[in-house]
Amino acid sequence: MRFHGFHAATLAVLAVLAAHPAVAKTISVSSTTPDANEKLQEALILAKPGDIVQLGAGVWKLVDGLSLDVANVTVRGAGAGEGGSILDFTGQQGAGEGLLVTSDDVYLTNFAVLNTKGDGIKSKGADRIVYHKLRVEWTAGPKETNGAYGIYPVESTDVLIDSVFVRGASDAGIYVGQSKNIVVRDSIATENVAGIEIENSYDADVHDNIATKNTGGILVFDLPSLPMQGGHNVRIFENIVNDNSTPNFAPKGNIVASVPTGTGVLVMANRHVEIFDNVLADNGTANVMIVGYRYEHKDAKYQPLPRDIVVRGNQHGKAGYAPAFEGGAQIA
């Protein structure tokens, strides 16, 4: 794996955090005890900085969302696949997240979150957070009633998303919003509306991922009327972005509801974006689209046009054969 440019130092710091979390004690929880759900949330509440919350192999049938507000805690499962540590929210009451993290220096690894009513795993204001070897999935496939986001860090600095799998999100599978110093790598996003989305964020590297069978593969947006604006310095490289052919199933009114089926990479109103060394193929609308924000808004400081966009050295396969926008049939 090659490190590229100014993100190498950030990535090195995050790698140290991922490999060597400070250890005070290990709190082991099991899915087989009668009060398994309560014990799991209790462990997240009572953990001290440096602790590891160790999830045993098994399935938790959860009706309420979980939360973590303690800094420097590792939540580690026994695997994200079958036979691993599965947090199943099929019976969840309400529409909240599966897991909400609001503390710094948290390391999440080796477990799965299924069928949440709201977002899968969300972190807010959580700096130096690592999402590693996680699976977030809506197992019935694409549905408008699925949760909006799978992996969802927002308002954070130093974010590493590494080797995750997300399927079925009704907005974005992997979404990073209003954040800075971001790495998304070695992950798979499939059958979401947007596979990977970087929104209103600074200094992001998105590389060595697979975005396939989404409505749109990788999106880089900057939107008006948000606290953090002027998204810039985003690099999309060495990804496979192919066959993004899933019909758009976002709820009406969502910004991604306007993404045409068959979009590979879409840049909207961002600045300083590089798209290079990717494999782009079988995206019916276009492999790459660079567009302005065309909706009415009242934000006087907002810049709706993209600037300083570089597209180079990509491997292009078949594309543009079924553009899913008004007038597309006439130009295909």
Where are these regions (language model features)?
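Short, T/G/N/S-enriched strand-turn elements that build extracellular solenoid repeat scaffolds
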Residues: 38-46, 61-70, 122-125, 230, ...
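Right-handed parallel beta-helix/beta-spiral solenoid domain characteristic of secreted/periplasmic
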Residues: 28-38, 52-54, 72-118, 140
